[in-house]
From Swiss-Prot:
Binds 1 [4Fe-4S] cluster. The cluster is coordinated with 3 cysteines and an exchangeable S-adenosyl-L-methionine. It comes from Methanocaldococcus jannaschii (strain ATCC 43067 / DSM 2661 / JAL-1 / JCM 10045 / NBRC 100440). Its cofactor is [4Fe-4S] cluster. This is UPF0313 protein MJ1155. SUPFAM superfamilies: Radical SAM enzymes. The lineage of its organism: Archaea, Methanobacteriati, Methanobacteriota, Methanomada group, Methanococci.
Length: 603
C-alpha cells in the first residue's frame, strides 16, 4: 500500500489528518532508493501518519494544500538529485528529460528546495519546515554554485526553513518528530544529523556545552578564495559541532548519525511496493533499479568530485547477511519480477564489511585509499564472495544476479588474499555485458587531484582481470568511465589519456564532463584554483571550447570529433599516435569517397 498522496488515499489508511507531509521534487516511487519513500515509511513504522506531495505545481497554492496542514511539520526535498544538476548539462544547457518524472517530462523547478519552502510558507503561515535530501545536504554551508558562478549562502538561510537534515535522514527526522510531538519548539532543537540557525547569544551557549569547530564566515569565503579553501579543509572531518557566521546569525551543524546493523535491516525490510505510484503511466527512473538490492551505505573512497563523503559519509554501515537474503527471497515473489536482480551493491559495490579497524573514519581527515591504502583499513572481499554464493544458491540458475554499482578496482588489487577470487566470482556470474569500472583518468597529475590511482595500477588491473576472466570463462570485457575537464586536466593530459586508451584497448563512450557540484573537493579546486589539501595551485579548464576539445580527444574514434580533436592537437603541437590514427582514418574516408564517386561516374 502506497503512502497517501490525496485525501481519498488518506481515507484508505483511515486517517483524517497527517502528522508530517513530505514534499519531493521526484515522482513518488515507493522504493528504498528514493529518499521521500524511505523517511516516509520509517515514520509510519514508528507510528506517525505521513503523506507525500510529489512534484507540486509551484505556480499556485492548490497542489501544496491538497493534504491539508500537518500536525507537526512539512519535510522538503528536491529529490534524488540536486535540481540544478537534474535540469542542466555541464555546458549549462537545459535538459529536455527528467528520469525521475512521469514520462520523463520535467516537473520540478530550479532550486526546488527554496521554491517548495516558499510555497509552503505562502500556503500555511507559521508551519515548521525541515529540509532534507541531497540538494539541502550539500548546500548546508556557504558553497560555490556553478550555475550562478558565485558563492551562495546555506540553503537553510536562503529558504528561511527552520531546520536542515543532512545525510540519509531517517533517525534525525524521527528525532525531530518526537521532539515536536512532546511540545518542543523546532527552533530550539539540537539533534545530530541536523543544521540549525541561531543568534549570537545561542552560539555562545553551544560553544560552552560542545566541542566546536568554526568555519570562516560566509563573508570571508565570498571575498577570499584562500578562506574558501580553508573552509573545505575544516569540513573534511565531522565529529565536532561545526558553526559558521552568516551576517548576524550562525549556522550550527551537529555531528552525523550512523546506523547500526539492526537499524539498517529495519529500514531496508520495510514494506516498499518497489514501483511508481499508480497515478503515473511510466517513470523511467524506476526501471534500472526496481530490483536492485542495497548491501551497505557509505564510501571511504574519497574521490574528489564525489558528494558521498559529505552525504553518506566514510563510515560503512552494513546490512546483515540475513536481511539481504531475506530481501532476495521476497524479490523472487514480486509480481513484476522477470528473472533479473539488477544490482547487488551500494555507492561502491565492493566495500561490504570493509572499513577502518579503529573506527576513526569520520574523525580522520586522511584519504583511506589514496595515495596508498591506510594501514588501519580492512580490505577483505571474503564476506562479499560468501554473500554472492548464498544469493546464487537461493535464486538458482534461472535468475541472473548482476553487480552494476561501481566497483573499486584498486580495492581488488590491494586485497592480496581474496582479490583474485573476487574477480573470478564477478566475471563468471555477476557481470552484464562488460565490467563497469571508473578509473576516471590515468595521468599522475590529474589522478592526484582526483585522489585516485594513476594508469599504472589500472593497467595491471586490466591485465589481471582479463587473464582471470578468460581462465574461468567469465566476461572479460571492461567498460571504463572517464572524467574530462577536471581541475589539473589540460589538453596535454587528455592526449595522455587517449594514448593510454589506444595502447590498452579500453576505448569507451562513457565520458563525463566534470560538473562542479556543491561541497566537493573538486568544486573547491574549480572555484579557487587551489587544492586545499596540498595548498598547490591547480590548472582549471574553464572554457566550453576547451571542454569540447577534451571530450573530442577522449572520443577520438568518432568521426564527428576528428576536426575538434585536431584543433586541440594543433594548440599544443601534438603529432603523436592519436594524431596519426585520425589522419589515417581521414585519408581512408577520403579515398572511399573518391572511389565511390568514380564508380558512380562509370555507371
Amino acid at each position: 500500500m502506497f503512502l497517501p498522496t490525496t485525501k481519498e488515499e488518506m481515507d484508505e489508511w483511515g486517517w483524517e489528518e497527517l502528522d508530517i507531509i513530505i514534499v519531493t521534487g521526484d515522482a513518488y516511487i515507493d522504493h528504498y532508493l528514493f529518499g521521500a519513500s524511505v523517511v516516509g515509511r520509517y515514520l509510519v513504522e514508528h507510528g506517525y501518519r505521513v503523506g507525500i506531495i510529489a512534484q507540486p505545481d509551484w505556480k499556485n497554492l492548490d497542489d501544496i494544500k491538497r493534504l491539508g496542514k500537518p500536525n507537526y511539520f512539512f519535510a522538503v526535498t528536491a529529490g534524488n538529485l540536486d535540481s540544478m544538476l537534474a535540469h542542466y548539462t555541464p555546458q549549462k544547457r537545459l535538459r529536455d528529460f527528467d528520469s525521475m518524472s512521469n514520462e520523463g517530462i520535467r516537473k520540478r523547478p530550479d532550486r526546488a528546495t527554496i521554491v517548495y519552502t516558499n510555497l509552503i510558507k505562502r500556503a500555511f503561515k507559521g508551519v515548521p519546515i525541515a529540509l532534507g535530501g541531497i540538494e539541502a545536504s550539500l548546500r548546508r554551508f556557504s558553497h560555490y554554485d556553478y550555475w550562478d558562478n558565485k558563492v551562495r549562502k546555506s540553503v537553510l538561510i536562503d529558504s528561511k526553513a527552520d531546520i536542515l537534515m543532512y545525510g540519509m535522514g531517517e533517525k534525525s527526522i524521527l528525532a525531530i518528530t518526537k521532539a515536536l510531538e512532546s511540545g518542543e519548539n523546532i527552533k530550539d532543537l539540537e539533534i545530530n544529523g541536523t543544521v540549525v540557525r541561531v543568534n549570537e547569544r545561542k552560539i555562545g551557549d553551544i560553544k560552552e556545552r560542545y566541542e566546536t569547530k568554526e568555519l570562516p564566515s560566509h563573508e570571508e569565503v565570498v571575498n577570499s578564495k584562500e578562506k574558501y579553501a580553508e573552509m573545505h579543509r575544516k569540513l573534511m572531518t565531522m565529529d565536532k559541532v561545526i558553526y559558521q557566521k552568516v551576517g548576524n546569525q550562525y549556522l550550527v551543524q551537529f555531528p552525523p548519525i550512523y546506523l547500526t546493523e539492526k537499524e539498517m535491516d529495519e529500514i531496508y525490510e520495510m514494506p516498499f511496493e518497489r514501483r511508481a505510484h499508480p497515478s503515473y503511466s511510466y517513470v523511467p527512473g524506476i526501471v534500472p533499479v526496481q530490483f536492485s538490492v542495497v548491501t551497505h551505505r557509505g564510501c571511504f573512497g574519497g574521490c574528489s568530485f564525489c558528494s558521498i563523503l559529505h552525504h553518506q559519509g566514510k563510515v560503512i554501515q552494513n546490512r546483515s547477511e540475513r536481511s539481504i537474503l531475506k530481501e532476495i527471497r521476497k524479490l523472487l515473489n514480486h509480481e513484476d519480477f522477470k528473472g533479473v536482480i539488477q544490482d547487488i551493491g551500494a555507492p561502491t559495490a565492493n566495500m561490504y564489511r570493509m572499513g577502518c579497524k579503529k573506527g576513526l573514519a569520520d574523525r580522520c581527515p586522511k584519504n583511506c585509499l589514496y595515495p596508498e591504502p591506510c594501514e588501519n583499513l580492512i580490505i577483505n572481499h571474503k564476506p562479499l564472495i560468501k554473500l554472492y554464493r548464498k544469493i546464487r544458491d537461493i535464486v538458482g540458475d534461472d535468475v541472473r544476479v548482476y553487480v552494476r554499482s561501481g566497483v573499486r578496482y584498486d580495492l581488488i588489487m590491494y586485497d592480496e588474499e581474496y582479490g583474485e577470487d573476487y574477480i573470478k566470482e564477478l566475471s563468471k556470474y555477476h557481470v552484464s555485458g562488460r565490467l563497469k569500472v571508473a578509473p576516471e583518468h590515468i595521468s599522475k597529475k590529474v589522478c592526484k587531484a582526483i585522489q585516485k590511482p594513476d594508469g599504472r595500477l589500472f593497467k595491471k588491473f586490466l591485465e589481471k582481470y582479463r587473464e582471470i576472466a578468460e581462465k574461468v570463462g567469465g566476461i572479460k570485457e571492461v567498460l571504463p568511465y572517464w572524467l574530462i575537464a577536471h581541475p589539473n586536466c589540460s589538453i596535454k593530459e587528455m592526449i595522455e589519456l587517449a594514448e593510454f586508451i589506444h595502447k590498452n584497448n579500453c576505448y569507451s563512450r562513457q565520458v563525463q564532463v566534470f560538473t562542479p557540484t556543491p561541497m566537493t573537493l573538486s568544486t573547491t579546486m574549480y572555484h579557487t584554483g587551489i587544492n586545499p589539501i596540498t595548498n598547490e595551485k591547480v590548472y582549471v579548464p574553464y572554457t566550453y571550447r576547451e571542454k569540447k576539445i577534451q571530450k573530442a580527444i577522449c572520443l577520438y574514434r568518432e568521426e564527428e570529433n576528428w576536426e575538434k580533436a585536431l584543433e586541440g592537437f594543433k594548440m599544443v603541437g601534438y603529432k603523436g599516435v592519436i594524431y596519426r590514427w585520425i589522419m589515417e582514418q581521414m585519408e581512408k574516408k577520403k579515398k572511399q569517397k573518391k572511389d565511390k564517386n568514380k564508380k558512380n561516374r562509370l555507371n
